[in-house]
């Protein structure tokens, strides 16, 4: 891994453009299966890598307008690492990548509605990742279900 200062500066520039009460959800590219037991050589998403310097598959960056960066990545799994290669894991990600916090990607659907609460807008790459719009709609529905408890749902997506 390289030093994270240029990536942190890029995240700060994007956060400033988002506005103080907005949030961006940026996924990396998925792995592409070649056949039943192997995948094509992985190529990360350029936007994601530009902001994080992180080139593992199945990861998400959530960036708030205040500059808070949350990474969701694959957990450490020594058995899978034999076949897939080294994984950084959520415990090491904040120190290595300079993000504020990191969680396992398995927690994404549970944590993202809370991160989206009380935001005016949510930004994400439209029509670039299969199924992303559906997931964002699901997260926004979860926020809408909490409106009677005082949560505000983003009005722009």
Residue ranges, per PLM feature:
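A composition/biophysics-driven feature that prefers long, compositionally simple stretches
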Residues: 1-157
């Amino acid at each position: 891994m390289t030093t994270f200062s240029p990536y942190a500066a890029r995240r700060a520039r994007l956060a400033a453009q988002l506005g103080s009460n907005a949030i961006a959800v940026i996924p990396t590219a998925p792995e592409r299966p070649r056949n039943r037991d192997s995948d094509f050589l992985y190529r990360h998403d350029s936007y994601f890598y530009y902001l994080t310097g992180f080139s593992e598959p199945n990861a998400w960056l959530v960036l708030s307008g205040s500059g808070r960066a949350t990474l969701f990545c694959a957990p450490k799994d020594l058995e899978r690492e034999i076949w897939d290669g080294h994984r950084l894991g959520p415990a090491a990600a904040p120190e290595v990548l300079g993000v504020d916090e990191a969680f396992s990607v398995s927690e994404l659907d549970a944590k993202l509605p809370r991160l989206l609460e009380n935001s005016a807008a949510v930004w994400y790459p439209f029509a670039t990742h299969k199924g992303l719009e559906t997931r964002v709609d699901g997260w926004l529905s979860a926020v809408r279900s909490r409106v009677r408890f005082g949560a505000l749902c983003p009005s722009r997506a």
